[in-house]
Design a protein with these regions (language model features):
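Recognition helix of helix-turn-helix DNA-binding domains
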Residues: 49-52, 56
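Ser/Thr-centric signal marking residues that sit
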Residues: 54, 63, 115
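A short, Lys/Arg-enriched amphipathic alpha-helix from helix-turn-helix/homeodomain DNA-binding modules
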Residues: 3-39, 45-48, 65, 69-88
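Terminal helix-turn-helix DNA-binding modules in bacterial transcription factors
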Residues: 38, 42, 61-101, 105, ...
């Protein structure tokens, strides 16, 4: 039921702009497949055949977000899916590559203005929170 509420939330709030450039899309897919991948953009860009500066520029042009913002948005979407499926916060934090649950909770609170636990207990979970 909670997943239904999250899915019913306005799409733009949970929307992740996907890059059109095939090299950048390949890089984005690597992170979507493994959101815990903490490699820096330099390493990911090189693997996709892009210079770091080109990857930075393309991310901004094609998604409207910087790379770090895009990665955080990706992780927030994965976090909401996992939390709504009942996974414990510590497990979600680990699955998303955070060193500690506290680091994950701090990021979540910056984005949604509340902790994951309070967010999930809210009557309209997912309905009123916008990703910052």
């Amino acid at each position: 039921m909670l997943l239904d509420e999250i899915e019913a939330a306005p799409r733009e709030r949970l929307h992740l702009p996907w890059p059109r450039d095939r090299r950048l899309a390949r890089l984005a897919q690597v992170l979507a497949d493994d959101p815990a991948d903490n490699r820096p953009l330099e390493a990911l860009a090189a693997r996709a055949g892009l210079a770091t500066r080109t990857a930075q520029r393309l991310f901004r042009e094609e998604t409207g977000l910087g790379f770090a913002q895009w990665r955080q948005q990706l992780r927030l979407i994965h976090a909401l899916e996992r939390l709504s499926a009942g996974q414990p916060v510590a497990q979600v934090a680990d699955a998303l590559g955070y060193a500690t649950p506290g680091n994950f909770i701090a990021m979540f609170k910056r984005a949604f203005g509340t902790t994951p636990g309070r967010y999930l207990r809210a009557p309209q979970a997912g309905g009123d929170a916008a990703v910052a």
